[in-house]
Amino acid sequence: MTQEVPRRLEPSPFEWKGDAGPSVKTLRPHAIPSVAIDLASVTKSYGDKPVVDGLSFTVAAGECFGLLGPNGAGKSTITRMILGMTTPATGVITVLGVPVPSRARLARMGIGVVPQFDNLDSEFTVRENLLVFGRYFRMSTREIEAVIPSLLEFARLENKVDARVSDLSGGMKRRLTLARALINDPQLLILDEPTTGLDPHARHLIWERLRSLLARGKTILLTTHIMEEAERLCDRLCVLEAGRKIAEGRPHVLIDEKIGCQVIEIYGGNPHELSALVSPHARHVEVSGETVFCYALDPEQVRVQLDGCAGVRFLQRPPNLEDVFLRLTGRELKD
């Protein structure tokens, strides 16, 4: 007996207006282009405030491309424009080979979205959530039921198929949201802060699942504030500030170009006195609160200087993407 699809209580951004229209099989782009996303000189303002300012970048098919930036940098607006939910003031956007927003409906049939906050139907079961979402792509109940086992296996939720979403852990909900985004076998995944709020075990499982999708040829556009996540997953990334691109490249290349030396974090003592002490042996020194960040040209000489300072602790480490991000955007809080 065919299971009845439950009624969803809230509208979906993928819900069509008017007639039923064609199914996902007939509406999605047929050919897989070599460039999944192309933005050319895109601008967008809200009132007198520009939020995206002459932005251009391309995302190649099969790569993970990261959008990094502080709050207010324009990441959410860029994502909405790529989905055709916000119209740019100027510039050209092409997604999966079709122009957006003029043919956003067609582009969205090849896109899966994992939003920052889970919008699952908590009163429905895992299976029911997938059944409901598949209908937004005009998939039949039989088609959806056919892919549910593989999606749940991918998300490691095989034994939760009939569990209510309200009974799932935070990590399970995120994995279900990822599985739901794959219901239409999309060419492109847009992930907004996919592991925010998860414990390390759940976060690493999501990363492992995302790497498996990249190995299968999926394209990922990732926005995140977790620099380790971007460094681990992204083939290339773009750093934004105030709607402008301030850096673009491969994570390890940006680390070499922008930092290029060992970092010594110094704690205790007077930070300004410590900064003056190590500056002769440093490429760059930053003070943030009670911590001194020394980008050391000669780490051994820095350690020699610090060894004579009572009560001072320090940690020497390789540079990372967080160092690049903070160097480019500053250490002050941005709301």
UniProtKB/Swiss-Prot annotation:
Cite the record's note on assembly: The complex is composed of two ATP-binding proteins (NodI) and two transmembrane proteins (NodJ).
Please list the residue ranges that the record marks as compositionally biased, kind Basic and acidic residues: 1-10
Question: How does the protein's chain sit in the membrane according to the entry?
Answer: Peripheral membrane protein
Enzyme nomenclature, EC number: 7.6.2.-
Region described as Disordered: spans on this chain: 1-22
Which UniProt keyword terms apply here? Answer: ATP-binding, Cell inner membrane, Cell membrane, Membrane, Nodulation, Nucleotide-binding, Plasmid, Translocase, Transport
Which organism is the protein's source?
Answer: Rhizobium meliloti
Q: Name one GO cellular component term.
A: plasma membrane
What name appears for this protein in its UniProt entry?
Nod factor export ATP-binding protein I
Signal peptide coordinates: none
One family from Pfam that matches here is ABC_tran
Q: Which residues does UniProt call coiled coil?
A: none
InterPro entries under this entry?
AAA+_ATPase, ABC_transporter-like_ATP-bd, ABC_transporter-like_CS, ABC_transporter_ATP-binding, ABC_transptNodI, P-loop_NTPase
**Gene Ontology MF terms in the entry:** ATP binding; ATP hydrolysis activity; transmembrane transporter activity
**Which family does the entry's similarity section mention?**
Belongs to the ABC transporter superfamily. Lipooligosaccharide exporter (TC 3.A.1.102) family.
Q: Which residues form the ABC transporter domain?
A: 37-267
Task: State what this protein does.
Answer: Part of the ABC transporter complex NodIJ involved in the export of the nodulation factors (Nod factors), the bacterial signal molecules that induce symbiosis and subsequent nodulation induction. Nod factors are LCO (lipo-chitin oligosaccharide), a modified beta-1,4-linked N-acetylglucosamine oligosaccharide. This subunit is responsible for energy coupling to the transport system.
* Location of this chain's protein in the cell: Cell inner membrane
List residues binding ATP: G69, P70, N71, G72, A73, G74, K75, S76
The UniProt record lists the keyword Translocase:
yes
